[in-house]
C-alpha cells in the first residue's frame, strides 16, 4: 500500500496558521453538528380524575366478578355412546355372511390315482351358527335391569350411566358374529383304495413276469386265473351291476332325508380306525410303511387349521364342527390364511367372567358337539348337573359298547359268508356311531327348550336311541352289501374292471354325470336353506333389535326434553339478576373514561401548537439560513480555485512531453537498434565459425576413422562368414523344430510411431542399436524384437527384462515412486529429469554424470539428448574409456563395425551439441531478465504498477491541479543531483555499451579455444575428444559463466532496470531479446527438422518451451492420432477447413491457434518443431497439463481418443459440448451489449490480456523520461520574494496500486490548495506547501 506523507516546515509561520485555520473549521463543524441535532419536547399532562376512574372501574369489575358466580354445566356423557351403539347396530345386517362350500374329495382322488369308488361315502353338513339371538336377549335384559334409575336432571347434568354404556359397547362385539351355512362333501376311503391299488399292481406285474418266463405258454394259458384276477373280475361285475346304481340311489335318498329330517344340522362322523378295519378285512392288512406315508399325508391335508374337511373361510377361521370354541379374532390378519376370523366366546365363559369365578374352578361340560354349539345361545340358568353328566356319559358310551359287541358276530365266518359277516359288523359300527351322534344332538336340541338339565338329558337319550337305531340299520345295510359281495361275481371282475385303464375311461362319463347331478342338488338345497335362514334366523333377530334401538333413543329423547325444560326456567332469572346489572355498570365506566381522554387531548394539542411555532421561529429557520450561506460561500471559493488550476495545467503537459518524454523515447530507440545489431553480428559469427569446424572435423576425425574401420572390417571378415554359417545352421535347426511342433513365432506389432520415423538414428536409440542385425545371434535377435519398451495403458501380461535392465514406472497411482524411478532411469540413460525447465537452464543445463556401469559394452552405451556444458571433461573421459573397452571387447567377443561405432560415439554427440547450441542464447536472455527482476523494485512490475498506472490516472486528472503543481514538478526535476540525461547515460547507455564490447569476444573465444584444443590433440582420437570437450566447456564457463548466467546478466541489468519502461512493446528489452534468441534457436533447430523423426521433433519443442520431459509420451500420442506423425498433413474436410482455417502440421493446429501460441521465432506452421511448440503453448494455457488433454485422459481411462477442445465461432443453433475436462471456457455473445463486453473483459483477464474500446479516446502512455523524472528526490527551494509557489514533489517511494490511491492523492492535493487559498484570502500571507 502506497504511503503518502506530508512534511511541513516547522519554521514556516504560514503552515502554523493553516493548522489553526483547520482547527477553526473543525470547531465550526462541531457547532454545526450541535445545531443540527434533533430537539425533543415531551409534554406530560397528568389527569388525576382519569386515574381514579380507572381504579374504580378495575375495583368494580374485580369485586363484582367475585361476588356473583353462576355456572350452568350440562355434562352429557350418553349421547356419544348411544350414537356409537346406533352405528354398530346399523352395521349388523351388512356384516352377516352366508358361506356355501362344496369340498369334493372324490374328484381329487380320481385325478391322482383313480381309486375304487365301491365304498365311497359322501356327507353333507348344514350348520346355522346363530350367536346373535342369545346376545340380543342378554342385552335387552341388561338394559332393562340397569336403566331403571334413569337420568338425574339438575343444573349440572350428571350422567350416572356412563359405565353402563361402556359395558354395552363392549357387549356389542356379539353383534359382529357371522352366520355360516356349510356344505361339506367328504371322502373317507380314497387313501385306503390307493394303497391297495399299488400293492395289487406289484403282485400283478410279478405274476405276469413269471408267466412270460415260463416256457410252456400253452399250458399256462389253460390254467385258472389266480386270486388277484378273480378279485378284479368280481369287483368289475359288482361295480357295474350293483355298486354304482346303489350309490346313485342311496345318494339321492340320503339327500332327501337330510333336507326333510334335519334342517338345522346333520353331522356324519365315521372314525378312521373303523374304515381301516373294514378295508383291512376286505383287502387284507397293509404294510406300515405305505399306510404311514399316505395316511399321515391325508390326515395332514384333512386336519389342517382350516377346520377339518371344509375349505370355506369360516373353517379357515376356526369355526368348524371339528373344533371346540377356538378363540380367533375378527378383522386381524393371520400369518398364513383366514382373513375373516370370528371370535367365539361361549355364554358360560361370559357369565363366569362377570361373576369372577376362576377358570380352574369353573364347571366343565361334556357331550356332543351339537350340544356345545347350542350352549352359546343359552342366556339363563346353568348347564351343569350330576344327572345331566351321568346321562351324557352313558349316551356317549353306548355307541362304542355297541361297536365292541359287534365283533362277536364274526363267529362262524367262512369263505362263502366272509363278505356278509364283515359287512354286517362294519355297518353296525358305522351306523351306531352315526346314529348316536345324530340322536344325541337332536335330543339335546329338543331338551334345550326345557332348560340346561333338559339339554343334557335329551342329548343322552338321543345318543342311546340313535346308536341303537343306527346300529340296527347299519348292520342290515352292511350285511346286504357283504352278501352281495359274496354271491355276485364281484371278486372275479375286480382285476378286469377296476384295474383296467379302458374300463375306467368308460366309467368316467357316468361319474361326471353323477357329480353334475350332485351339484344341481346342492344348488336346489341351498335355495331352500337360504329361504329358511331368512325366515327363521335373520327376520327374528332384526325384529328383536329394532325395539331395543328405539327404546334407547326414546330414553335419551326424554332426558333432553327435561334439560330444555330446566334451562327455560333458569334463563329469565339469569338475565334479570346477572347480565343486565353487569352490562349497565360497564357501559357507565367506559363512557366516563372516554370523556376524560378527550379533555386531556384538547389541552395537549393546544400546548404543542405554541411550542412548535416558537421552535420554527427561534431555532430551525436561523440555523438553516446560516448553514446554507456558509456552504454557498465555500463552494464558490473552491470553484474559483479550480478554474485557476485547470488553466495552468495545459502548459505543464506541453513542457512534460518536450523535456521528459521525448528524450527518453529517443534514447531507448537507439539502444534497441544497437542491441539488435550486436545479436545479428554474434549469430553470423557463430555460423561462419561452424563451417570451419565442420570442415576440420571431417578432415582430421571423420575420414581417418572411416579408413580405420574399413581396415578392421577387412581383418575380421572371417568372423562374419563364421557367424553367417553358424546362424544358418541354427536357423535350419529351428526350422526343423517348427516342422515337428507346428509352432511358429507370432509377428510383432510394431508401434505406429516407429513406422513414421526416418532411417536416421534417433537420439535415444543410437547407443541401444546393434551395429547390424546380421551380426547378432538368433537368440539376441529374438530378444531385440521384444525388448522395445513402450507405454502401457491397460492391464497387460508382458515379457520384461528379456534383453537387459528395464524400468517399470507407474504414472497414474503411486506417483511418488514413479518420479523416483523416472529419475533413476534418466540417470542410467545419461539424462536429467527436471520439473522446471527454467531452473534447468539457469543452472547451465548441467547433466547427470554418466556412470561407468551404465555402459559396459558398445551395445548398451548412453548419451544425453542435450548438450552437456558443465561436465564435458568427465563425460569425454567416460566416452573414451567406453570406446577402449568396447573396442577391445568387440575384437575379442564379436565383430563390430567401425562405422556404427563412429556414428554412435562421435557423430551423434557432436550433432547433439549443434542442436543444443540454441539454448545458449536463451540462457543469456533468461539470465538478463532474471537480473532485471532481481532488482530492489523490479523493472517490469515497478514500472507497470508504480509508474505507468498511477501516471495514467494522474494525467486524466492533472488538468485540475494548477500551475503550482507544474512548476514544483519542473523544479524538482532540475534540482536533482544527476539529472535526466546523466541518469540515462549512467544507467542505460554505459551498461549496454559494456555488453556490446564484451559480446564480441564470446564467439571468438569459444571457437578459437575449440579449434586450438582439437588441433593440439588430433593425433589421438581419445585425447582429442577429451581436450575438445574441455576447451568448449572452459570457453563457455569463462566467457559466459554459463553455469550461472544469472550472475553475469544480473550485473548487466541491475542498473538498467530503473527508468526503462519495459511495459511498452516497442522498447521491451526482454521481448526483443527473446525474439532475437528465438530466431537464432529456430535457425539452429530447423537444421534437422525435416530429416528427423517425431520423437526428435517433440524433444526439440520440449526443450524450446521449457516443458517437462514427462510430456513426451502424451505429445507423441497426440501427434500419432492427429497427423500420424506427418508434418505436412492438412485437414480439408472438417468445420475449420470450411471456415478457411484448416488444421495442419504435426499436431494439427489451426492457424489462429498457432499464431496465438507460437514460440518466439517459430512462425512456420509446417515445421514440426514450430507446430509442436505452439501446441504445447496451447495445452499449457488451455488445460494446464498434458494429462488433462481430453484425448490423453480418455485413453488412460480405457476409452477412445478425443480430439482438441478448440473453441470457435458459433453461427447457427446447435448442441455442443463445452468445458471438456472440467476446463473453463467463455461463451461470449457477439452483440455489443453490456453482458457481451463484460464477458469479453473477463475472458481477456483470464488470458492475461487487455480489452480496449476504439470508440473512446485513449491517453498516450508515459515514456521512461517520466520515470526518471520522478524517481529522484529533491529538496524544496526558497520561494522568490513576491511570488507564490506550491511544490508537489514525487519520488520512487510513492506507489500507486489502483485508482483509489490516485483519487485519494488528488483529493488531498485539492484540499491543500483550498486551505492555502482560503488562508491567503483571509490573512493575506504567502507560503509554500511541500507535499511528498
From Swiss-Prot:
Region labeled Disordered — which residues? 202-225, 324-368, 744-771
Pfam families reported in the protein's UniProt record: SLT
Instruction: Give start-end positions of Basic and acidic residues composition bias.
Output: 202-222
Output compositional bias ranges, type Polar residues: 355-368
State which gene encodes it.
Answer: xkdO
Instruction: Look up and give the organism this protein is from.
Output: Bacillus subtilis (strain 168)
> What family is it from?
To B.subtilis YqbO.
Alphabetical list of Gene3D superfamilies matching this protein: 1.10.530.10
Q: Which SUPFAM superfamilies match?
A: Lysozyme-like
> What is the recorded name of this protein?
Phage-like element PBSX protein XkdO
Compositionally biased tracts (Basic residues): 324-335
PANTHER family according to UniProt: CHANNEL_COLICIN DOMAIN-CONTAINING PROTEIN, MOTILE SPERM PROTEIN
Q: Where is the signal peptide?
A: none
Amino acid at each position: 500500500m502506497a504511503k503518502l506523507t506530508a512534511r511541513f516546515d516547522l519554521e514556516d509561520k504560514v503552515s502554523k496558521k493553516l493548522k489553526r485555520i483547520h482547527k477553526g473549521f473543525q470547531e465550526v463543524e462541531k457547532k454545526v453538528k450541535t445545531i443540527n441535532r434533533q430537539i425533543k419536547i415531551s409534554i406530560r399532562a397528568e389527569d388525576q380524575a382519569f386515574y381514579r376512574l380507572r381504579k374504580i372501574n378495575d375495583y368494580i369489575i374485580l369485586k363484582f366478578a367475585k361476588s356473583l358466580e353462576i355456572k350452568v354445566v350440562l355434562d352429557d356423557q350418553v349421547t356419544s355412546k348411544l350414537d356409537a351403539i346406533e352405528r354398530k347396530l346399523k352395521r349388523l345386517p351388512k356384516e352377516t355372511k352366508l358361506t356355501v362350500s362344496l369340498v369334493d374329495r372324490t374328484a381329487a382322488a380320481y385325478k391322482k390315482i383313480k381309486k375304487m369308488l365301491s365304498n365311497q361315502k359322501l356327507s353333507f353338513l348344514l350348520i346355522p351358527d346363530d350367536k346373535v339371538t342369545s346376545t340380543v336377549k342378554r342385552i335387552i335384559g341388561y338394559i332393562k335391569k340397569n336403566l331403571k334409575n334413569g337420568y338425574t336432571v339438575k343444573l349440572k347434568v350428571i350422567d350416572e350411566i356412563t359405565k353402563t354404556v361402556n359395558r354395552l359397547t363392549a357387549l356389542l362385539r356379539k353383534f359382529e358374529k357371522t352366520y355360516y351355512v356349510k356344505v361339506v362333501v367328504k371322502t373317507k376311503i380314497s387313501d385306503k383304495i390307493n394303497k391297495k391299488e399299488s400293492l395289487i399292481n406289484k403282485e400283478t406285474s410279478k405274476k405276469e413276469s413269471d408267466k412270460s418266463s415260463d416256457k410252456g405258454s400253452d399250458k399256462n394259458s389253460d390254467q385258472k386265473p389266480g386270486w388277484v384276477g378273480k378279485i378284479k373280475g368280481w369287483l368289475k361285475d359288482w361295480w357295474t351291476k350293483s355298486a354304482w346304481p346303489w350309490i346313485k340311489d342311496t345318494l339321492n335318498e340320503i339327500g332327501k332325508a337330510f333336507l326333510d329330517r334335519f334342517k338345522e344340522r346333520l353331522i356324519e362322523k365315521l372314525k378312521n380306525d373303523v374304515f381301516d378295519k373294514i378295508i383291512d378285512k376286505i383287502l387284507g392288512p397293509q404294510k406300515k410303511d405305505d399306510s404311514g406315508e399316505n395316511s399321515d399325508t391325508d390326515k395332514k391335508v384333512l386336519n389342517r387349521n382350516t377346520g377339518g374337511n371344509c375349505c370355506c373361510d369360516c373353517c379357515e377361521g376356526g369355526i368348524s364342527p371339528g373344533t371346540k370354541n377356538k378363540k380367533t379374532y375378527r378383522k386381524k390378519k393371520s400369518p398364513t390364511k383366514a382373513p375373516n376370523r370370528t371370535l367365539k366366546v361361549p355364554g358360560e365363559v361370559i357369565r363366569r367372567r362377570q361373576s369372577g369365578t376362576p377358570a380352574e374352578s369353573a364347571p366343565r361340560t361334556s357331550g356332543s358337539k351339537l350340544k356345545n354349539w347350542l350352549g352359546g345361545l343359552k342366556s339363563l340358568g346353568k348347564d351343569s348337573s350330576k344327572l345331566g353328566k351321568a346321562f351324557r356319559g352313558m349316551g356317549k358310551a353306548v355307541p362304542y359298547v355297541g361297536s365292541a359287541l359287534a365283533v362277536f358276530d364274526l363267529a362262524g365266518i367262512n369263505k362263502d359268508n366272509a363278505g356278509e359277516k364283515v359287512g354286517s359288523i362294519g355297518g353296525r359300527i358305522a351306523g351306531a356311531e352315526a346314529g348316536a351322534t345324530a340322536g344325541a344332538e337332536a335330543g339335546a336340541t329338543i331338551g334345550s327348550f326345557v332348560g340346561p338339565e333338559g339339554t343334557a338329558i335329551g342329548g343322552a337319550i338321543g345318543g342311546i336311541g340313535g346308536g341303537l337305531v343306527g346300529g340296527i340299520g347299519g348292520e342290515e345295510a352292511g350285511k346286504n352289501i357283504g352278501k352281495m359281495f359274496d354271491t355276485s361275481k364281484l371278486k372275479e371282475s375286480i382285476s378286469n374292471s377296476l384295474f383296467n385303464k379302458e374300463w375306467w375311461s368308460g366309467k368316467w362319463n357316468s361319474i361326471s354325470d353323477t357329480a353334475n347331478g350332485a351339484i344341481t342338488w346342492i344348488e336346489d338345497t341351498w335355495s331352500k336353506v337360504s329361504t329358511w335362514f331368512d325366515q327363521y334366523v335373520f327376520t327374528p333377530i332384526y325384529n328383536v333389535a329394532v325395539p331395543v334401538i328405539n327404546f334407547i333413543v326414546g330414553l335419551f329423547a326424554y332426558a333432553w326434553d327435561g334439560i330444555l325444560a330446566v334451562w327455560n326456567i333458569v334463563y329469565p332469572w339469569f338475565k334479570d339478576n346477572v347480565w343486565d346489572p353487569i352490562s349497565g355498570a360497564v357501559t357507565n365506566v367506559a363512557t366516563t373514561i372516554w370523556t376524560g381522554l378527550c379533555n386531556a387531548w384538547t389541552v395537549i394539542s393546544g400546548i404543542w401548537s405554541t411550542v412548535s411555532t416558537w421552535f420554527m421561529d427561534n431555532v430551525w429557520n436561523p440555523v438553516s439560513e446560516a448553514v446554507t450561506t456558509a456552504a454557498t460561500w465555500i463552494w464558490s471559493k473552491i470553484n474559483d480555485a479550480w478554474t485557476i488550476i485547470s488553466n495552468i495545467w495545459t502548459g505543464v503537459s506541453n513542457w512534460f512531453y518536450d523535456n521528459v518524454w521525448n528524450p527518453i523515447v529517443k534514447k531507448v530507440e537507439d539502444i534497441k537498434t544497437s542491441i539488435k545489431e550486436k545479436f545479428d553480428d554474434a549469430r553470423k559469427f557463430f555460423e561462419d565459425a561452424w563451417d570451419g569446424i565442420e570442415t576440420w572435423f571431417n578432415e582430421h576425425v571423420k575420414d581417418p576413422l572411416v579408413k580405420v574401420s574399413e581396415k578392421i572390417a577387412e581383418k575380421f571378415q572371417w568372423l562374419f562368414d563364421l557367424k553367417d554359417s553358424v546362424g544358418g545352421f541354427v536357423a535350419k535347426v529351428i526350422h526343423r523344430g517348427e516342422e515337428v511342433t507346428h509352432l511358429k513365432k507370432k509377428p510383432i506389432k510394431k508401434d505406429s510411431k516407429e513406422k513414421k520415423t526416418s532411417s536416421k538414428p534417433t537420439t535415444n536409440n543410437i547407443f541401444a542399436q546393434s551395429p547390424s542385425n546380421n551380426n547378432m545371434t538368433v537368440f539376441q535377435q529374438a530378444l531385440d524384437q521384444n525388448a522395445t519398451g513402450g507405454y502401457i495403458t491397460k492391464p497387460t501380461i508382458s515379457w520384461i527384462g528379456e534383453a537387459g535392465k528395464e524400468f517399470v514406472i507407474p504414472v497414474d497411482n503411486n506417483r511418488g515412486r514413479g518420479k523416483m524411478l523416472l529419475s533413476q532411469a534418466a540417470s542410467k540413460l545419461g539424462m536429467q529429469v527436471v520439473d522446471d525447465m527454467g531452473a534447468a537452464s539457469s543452472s547451465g543445463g548441467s547433466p547427470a554424470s554418466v556412470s561407468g556401469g551404465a555402459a559396459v559394452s558398445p551395445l548398451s552405451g548412453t548419451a544425453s539428448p542435450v548438450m552437456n556444458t558443465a561436465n564435458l571433461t568427465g563425460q569425454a573421459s567416460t566416452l573414451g574409456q567406453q570406446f577402449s573397452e568396447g573396442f577391445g571387447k568387440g575384437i575379442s567377443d564379436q565383430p563390430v563395425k567401425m562405422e556404427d561405432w563412429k556414428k554412435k560415439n562421435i557423430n551423434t554427440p557432436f550433432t547433439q551439441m549443434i542442436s543444443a547450441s540454441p539454448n545458449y542464447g536463451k540462457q543469456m536472455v533468461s539470465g538478463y531478465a532474471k537480473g532485471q527482476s532481481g532488482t530492489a523494485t523490479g523493472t517490469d512490475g515497478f514500472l507497470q504498477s508504480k509508474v505507468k498506472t498511477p501516471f495514467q490516472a494522474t494525467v486524466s486528472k492533472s488538468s485540475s491541479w494548477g500551475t503550482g503543481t507544474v512548476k514544483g514538478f519542473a523544479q524538482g526535476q532540475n534540482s536533482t543531483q544527476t539529472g535526466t540525461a546523466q541518469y540515462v547515460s549512467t544507467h542505460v547507455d554505459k551498461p549496454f555499451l559494456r555488453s556490446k564490447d564484451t559480446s564480441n569476444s564470446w564467439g571468438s573465444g569459444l571457437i578459437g579455444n575449440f579449434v586450438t584444443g582439437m588441433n593440439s590433440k588430433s593425433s589421438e582420437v581419445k585425447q582429442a575428444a577429451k581436450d575438445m570437450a574441455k576447451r568448449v566447456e572452459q570457453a563457455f564457463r569463462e566467457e559466459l559463466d554459463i553455469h550461472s548466467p544469472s550472475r553475469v546478466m544480473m550485473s548487466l541489468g541491475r542498473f538498467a532496470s530503473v527508468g526503462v519502461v519495459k511495459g511498452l512493446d516497442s522498447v521491451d528489452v526482454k521481448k526483443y531479446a527473446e525474439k532475437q534468441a528465438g530466431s537464432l534457436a529456430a535457425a539452429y533447430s530447423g537444421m534437422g527438422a525435416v530429416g528427423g523423426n517425431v520423437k526428435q521433433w517433440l524433444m526439440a519443442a520440449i526443450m524450446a518451451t521449457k516443458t517437462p520431459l514427462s510430456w513426451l509420451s502424451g505429445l507423441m500420442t497426440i501427434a500419432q492420432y492427429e497427423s500420424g506423425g506427418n508434418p505436412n498433413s492438412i485437414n480439408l474436410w472438417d468445420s475449420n477447413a470450411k471456415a478457411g482455417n484448416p488444421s495442419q502440421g504435426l499436431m494439427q493446429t489451426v492457424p489462429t491457434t498457432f499464431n496465438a501460441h507460437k514460440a518466439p521465432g517459430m512462425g512456420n506452421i509446417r515445421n514440426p518443431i514450430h507446430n509442436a511448440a505452439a501446441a504445447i503453448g496451447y495445452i499449457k494455457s488451455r488445460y494446464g497439463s498434458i494429462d488433462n488433454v481430453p484425448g490423453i485422459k480418455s485413453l488412460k481411462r480405457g476409452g477412445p481418443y478425443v480430439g482438441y477442445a478448440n473453441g470457435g465461432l458459433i453461427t447457427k443453433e446447435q448442441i455442443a459440448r463445452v468445458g471438456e475436462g472440467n476446463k473453463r471456457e467463455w461463451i461470449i455473445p457477439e452483440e455489443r451489449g453490456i453482458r457481451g463486453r463484460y464477458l469479453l473483459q473477463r475472458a481477456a483477464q483470464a488470458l492475461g490480456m487487455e480489452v480496449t474500446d476504439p470508440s473512446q479516446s485513449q491517453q498516450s502512455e508515459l515514456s521512461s523520461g517520466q520515470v526518471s523524472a520522478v524517481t529522484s528526490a529533491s529538496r524544496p527551494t526558497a520561494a522568490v520574494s513576491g511570488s507564490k509557489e506550491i511544490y508537489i514533489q514525487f519520488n520512487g517511494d510513492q506507489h500507486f496500486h489502483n485508482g483509489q490511491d490516485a483519487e485519494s492523492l488528488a483529493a488531498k492535493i485539492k484540499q491543500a490548495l483550498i486551505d492555502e487559498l482560503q488562508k491567503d484570502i483571509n490573512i493575506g500571507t504567502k507560503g509554500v506547501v511541500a507535499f511528498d
